[in-house]
């Protein structure tokens, strides 16, 4: 057992909260202290929401889980929070599959797709670091993707099986080795890596699953621990002496031997019942398949203590009743903790939809004898279960969704940008002669070396408009869903560099399109009600022009819809609040000139910092060249993950898929 140590949260920043940040921080902190369950921070684009969230965490002092809707955003938040809290434990918990194809069965073609997963070692280490941090100290912030609602082992078992070593403790070497094997560490005297230990005489070196380069050297004198030291596993350099060290299990699905025996009996009983059912239905192939697969897994569990796909037996391993709520990361937090949901208008619907998608796929596997029915209990939480497990939540969004609006009595607003930038001016113009009018507006921006985004409703409209603009001599490109990741990033970068002046697209709301050079956003068919022209989508689209001090939006429409009216009124309201603030403090709005980074080194053309060799992708390649490029990108991807630059690693991974698919 380990004791949770208390440390205060300390923010490192050159800035103090300003604008309406202090008020937002105070309101949320008071709400949390008063026991409010739901609060929403309505933060406009560019108002410093992350800084506000950091200050709330510092004031409240509770362990905090921050959920983002994808790995890229989680990676960005992780980097930002790590900068704000260098003295505290900021952890990262996302799905550890670089590439994950879950097992599935397609009955129509009789195709079974094996689980194909390449586990990213760094991310697995970070997951272990996150769970162990929660049992060691209370100043923990975990940034997670929605995968945090997926099943994990029993936290009590995980905590109880910690191997504790202390100087002067009576314990002989073989007892320590036995305990390490019980928590799924393997002995490996040659290839020393995470989750293994090696033995040299009276010295045992352990490489904890939660550490990156640090191993623990335990020295024995007879039946007593004589010395404990932290050592760099590569160089052998002694980093520091320790009086005590807690070694957490190498797997989250760890089970005591006596429990494992009971679990195996339960699995055998379920298998027997299920085989009878299948044979009674004359599903002989399915029965044979299930018997073969399950018996193989059981044999592995008896011999090794685990098997591939052990998570499918989690309901038995944790000795829970069938159909009960699985353990997840949420159970690893104590009684008093906080949840923040970033971009909640996207993240909450994702949390809500996880269970059904997972259930449908697994049901097919169960029906066709690939898995026992209890595999259905290795699942994400249902939304109601998520609600039950969370105590206090803060939703963060520029456009809160219906759930947040319904559950929050008063929105905490953060409208003022410290930079003084205003929300753009909006003009509604009739659709008659709209294209010629649009061309003259673009021309004005081109002369000022500014950029334009044009959003349409259909693919055909986008294509026709792009062709028409090209014929009129405008440097334009079209961004649509079929464009691959690499091309998409190149197009956005080229827009910033001035290779293009205009981008035309249907849904320009995806992350990565916050471009300071854009001074005009044009919305065609603004009066056609629907998902892409809802008040939430319109506000998000308008926000794309809020990073430039000359930002303007033109909506082409023949009537004023409710969504348009709401978006225009809300933007004007925010604009007026910012103007008053600027006047009072003598602030002149100024575009922030963000450096044009290469998200991926493979797209480098003429960046002045590009002095080290990078992977460049030629348009046509021989088989040999393609393989070499794939190898180079693979190296870069692993390095990016090691450097915790998950945004870059994700982009590189997508490039790899594209190259492999083309090959």
Swiss-Prot record:
Residue ranges annotated for the Helicase C-terminal domain, each copy included: 434-600
GO molecular function, one term: DNA binding
Positions of the UVR domain: 627-662
Keyword Nucleotide-binding (UniProt): yes
GO CC terms: cytoplasm; excinuclease repair complex
UniProt-listed InterPro entries: Helicase/UvrB_N (IPR006935), Helicase_ATP-bd (IPR014001), Helicase_C-like (IPR001650), P-loop_NTPase (IPR027417), UVR_dom (IPR001943), UVR_dom_sf (IPR036876), UvrB (IPR004807), UvrB_inter (IPR041471)
Family per similarity comment: Belongs to the UvrB family.
Domain-level remarks: The beta-hairpin motif is involved in DNA binding.
Self-association state and partner proteins as the record states: Forms a heterotetramer with UvrA during the search for lesions. Interacts with UvrC in an incision complex.
NCBIfam families named in the record: PRK05298.1, uvrb
Biological function: The UvrABC repair system catalyzes the recognition and processing of DNA lesions. A damage recognition complex composed of 2 UvrA and 2 UvrB subunits scans DNA for abnormalities. Upon binding of the UvrA(2)B(2) complex to a putative damaged site, the DNA wraps around one UvrB monomer. DNA wrap is dependent on ATP binding by UvrB and probably causes local melting of the DNA helix, facilitating insertion of UvrB beta-hairpin between the DNA strands. Then UvrB probes one DNA strand for the presence of a lesion.
Descriptive protein name: UvrABC system protein B
Organism: Staphylococcus aureus (strain MSSA476)
Gene name of this polypeptide: uvrB
């Amino acid at each position: 057992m380990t004791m949770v140590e208390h440390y205060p949260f300390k923010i490192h920043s050159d800035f103090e909260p300003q604008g309406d940040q202090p008020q937002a921080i105070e309101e949320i902190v008071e709400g949390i202290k008063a026991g409010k369950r739901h609060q929403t921070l309505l933060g406009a684009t560019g108002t410093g929401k992350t800084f506000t969230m950091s200050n709330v965490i510092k004031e409240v002092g509770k362990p905090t889980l921050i959920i983002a809707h994808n790995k890229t955003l989680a990676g960005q938040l992780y980097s930002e929070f790590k900068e704000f809290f260098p003295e505290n434990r900021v952890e990262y918990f996302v799905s550890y599959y670089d590439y994950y194809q879950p097992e599935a069965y397609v009955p129509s073609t009789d195709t079974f797709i094996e689980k194909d997963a390449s586990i990213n070692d760094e991310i697995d280490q970070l997951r272990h670091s996150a769970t162990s941090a929660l049992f060691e100290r209370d100043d923990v912030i975990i940034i997670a993707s929605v995968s945090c609602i997926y099943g994990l082992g029993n936290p009590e078992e995980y905590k109880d099986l910690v191997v504790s070593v202390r100087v002067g403790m009576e314990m002989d070497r073989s007892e320590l080795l036995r305990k390490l094997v019980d928590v799924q560490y393997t002995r490996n005297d040659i290839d020393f890596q995470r989750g293994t230990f090696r033995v040299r005489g009276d010295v045992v070196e352990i490489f904890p699953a939660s550490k990156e380069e640090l191993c623990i050297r335990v020295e024995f004198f007879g039946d007593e621990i004589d010395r404990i030291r932290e050592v760099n596993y590569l160089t052998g350099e002694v980093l520091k002496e320790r009086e005590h060290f807690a070694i957490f299990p190498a797997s989250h699905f760890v089970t005591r031997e006596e429990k494992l025996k009971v679990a195996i009996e339960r699995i055998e009983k379920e298998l027997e019942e299920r085989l009878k059912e299948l044979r009674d239905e004359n599903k002989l192939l399915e029965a044979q398949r299930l018997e073969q697969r399950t018996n193989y897994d059981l044999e592995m569990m008896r011999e090794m203590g685990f098997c591939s796909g052990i998570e499918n037996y989690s309901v038995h391993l944790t000795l829970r009743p069938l159909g009960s709520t699985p353990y997840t990361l949420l159970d690893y937090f104590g009684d008093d903790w906080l949840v923040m949901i970033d971009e909640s208008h996207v993240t909450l619907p994702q949390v809500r939809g996880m269970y059904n998608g997972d259930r449908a796929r697994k049901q097919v596997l169960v029906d066709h004898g690939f898995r026992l029915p209890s595999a259905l209990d290795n699942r994400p939480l249902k939304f109601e279960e998520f609600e039950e497990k969370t105590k206090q939540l803060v939703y963060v969004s520029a456009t809160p969704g219906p759930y947040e609006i319904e559950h929050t009595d008063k929105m905490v607003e953060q409208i003022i940008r410290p930079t003084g930038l205003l929300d753009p001016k909006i003009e509604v113009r009739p659709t008659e002669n709209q294209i010629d009018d649009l061309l003259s507006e673009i021309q004005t921006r081109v002369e000022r070396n500014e950029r334009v985004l044009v959003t349409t409703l259909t693919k055909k409209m986008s294509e026709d408009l792009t062709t028409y603009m090209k014929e009129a001599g405008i440097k334009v490109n079209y961004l649509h869903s079929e464009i691959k990741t690499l091309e998409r990033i190149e197009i956005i970068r080229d827009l910033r560099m001035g290779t293009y002046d205009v981008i035309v697209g249907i849904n320009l709301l995806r992350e990565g399109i916050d471009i300071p050079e854009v001074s005009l956003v044009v919305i065609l068919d603004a009066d056609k009600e629907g998902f892409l022209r809802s008040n939430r989508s319109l506000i998000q689209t308008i926000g794309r022009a809020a990073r430039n001090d000359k930002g303007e939006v033109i909506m082409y429409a023949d009537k004023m819809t409710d969504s348009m009216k709401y978006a225009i009124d809300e933007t004007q309201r925010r604009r007026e609040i910012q103007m008053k603030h600027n006047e009072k403090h003598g602030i002149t709005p100024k575009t922030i000139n963000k450096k044009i980074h290469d998200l991926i080194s493979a797209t480098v053309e003429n960046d002045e910092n590009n002095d080290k060799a990078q992977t460049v992708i030629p348009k046509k390649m021989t088989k040999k060249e393609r393989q070499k490029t794939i190898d180079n990108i693979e190296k870069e991807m692993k390095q990016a993950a090691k450097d915790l630059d998950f945004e870059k690693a994700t982009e590189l991974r997508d490039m790899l898929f594209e190259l492999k698919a083309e090959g």
